[in-house]
């Protein structure tokens, strides 16, 4: 990682920000407010044989060409694959999510993304929720503190009020 580019949780831990909005990471301890569960989907070429299934077994990624989305998304993908000891042939993709989806549509591999990442970009591919169910929890992180400023508490209340219908 570029030392000049800090990830949200690193900024929070270093005290360089009061609030972050991110996908929850188990290794980080903070005051966490869950806001949305973002479900994982298999992204497959349109002609991928699914045999009428309505979900894609995680185990089926094993040994397949897997186009890994860019950024720290590998953390979420590995969290979904590890419990089943699934090991796809990972091909890191240093391009945006839409380009990864286009690569899948051209038969260059398969991938896994969350609903938010793929929303509105599924032309030319087939999408199925993975099974067992997997995803990431999106939320708001704050410092662990007994003296949280009133402004931050009001922000959290406002965010919870606004997102109440999104889950």
Language model features by range: what are they?
Residues 1-27, 94:
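Central regulatory/effector-binding core of bacterial HTH transcription factors
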Residues 64-89, 148-156, 166:
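Secondary-structure junction motif
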Residues 4-5, 57, 95-96, 114:
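Short loop/turn segments at beta->alpha junctions
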Residues 31-41, 111, 115-116, 123-138:
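Short beta-strand->loop
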Residues 30-40, 44-66, 150:
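Flexible hinge/capping segments at coil-to-helix
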Residues 127-167:
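A late-sequence structural motif
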Residues 12-13, 61, 102-108, 140:
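Hydrophobic residues within well-ordered alpha-helices
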Residues 17, 23-30, 79, 97-126:
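A ligand-binding cleft/hinge motif common to bilobed small-molecule-binding domains
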């Amino acid at each position: 990682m570029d030392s000049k580019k800090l990830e949200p949780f690193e900024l929070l831990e270093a005290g360089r920000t009061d609030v972050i909005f991110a996908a929850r990471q188990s290794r980080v301890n903070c005051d966490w407010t869950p806001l949305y569960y973002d479900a994982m989907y298999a992204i497959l070429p349109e002609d991928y044989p699914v045999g009428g299934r309505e979900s894609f077994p995680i185990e089926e990624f094993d040994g397949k060409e897997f186009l890994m989305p860019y950024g720290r998304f590998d953390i979420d993908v590995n969290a979904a694959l590890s419990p089943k000891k699934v090991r796809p042939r990972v091909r890191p993709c240093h391009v945006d999510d839409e380009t990864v989806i286009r690569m899948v549509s051209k038969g260059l591999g398969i991938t896994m993304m969350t609903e938010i990442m793929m929303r509105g970009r599924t032309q030319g591919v087939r999408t199925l929720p993975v099974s067992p169910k997997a995803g990431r929890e999106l939320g708001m992180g704050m410092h662990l503190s007994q003296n949280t400023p009133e402004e931050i508490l009001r922000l959290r209340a406002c965010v919870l009020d606004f997102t109440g219908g999104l889950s």
